[in-house]
Structures are given as structure tokens and as C-alpha cells.
UniProtKB/Swiss-Prot annotation:
Transmembrane segments: none annotated. The active site is at 19 (cysteine persulfide intermediate). NCBIfam families: PRK00299.1. Sulfur carrier protein which probably makes part of a sulfur-relay system. This is Sulfur carrier protein TusA. Keywords: Cytoplasm.
Amino acid sequence: MNDQFSAAQHQLDALGLRCPEPVMMVRKSVRRMNDGETLLIIADDPATTRDIPSFCEFMDHTLIASQTESTPYQYLIKKGL
């Protein structure tokens, strides 16, 4: 696992979930976080490759890193900009 991913303060396992569940879970998790905290999302739904970056842009969060070449996909987001 990339050092960036392993340093996440929170983790969300969305394996086996299909759209729209992963993004709904991300939204719920982020709401409980403080600004500046990080969340590692692990997912295997191909729709997350589009949905999570769009969610970050729409909700003004930062997508720090992503790994979408093979499953499980990994996304590291920071709450807020």
C-alpha cells in the first residue's frame, strides 16, 4: 500500500457495494470528520472511478490520491479544500 494511503486518518470499506451506495457512505463518513482529516476509501465498483472524483469536486473536498488501475480501487480524500 502506498504511504499516502496508509497514512489516512479514517478508512471506509465499500467492497461489494454498487452505485450509489459507495458515494452515499463516503458522504456519511465525511460528515463525521473534521476539516483537514483524510479518508481512505477502498471499493471495487467501476462507477467509483467517476463518482468519487465528481463527489470531491462538487462538495469541495480534495482528492489527494487514487489508484484505479486494478481492484480494489483506492481513493484518499481530504475534507475541505
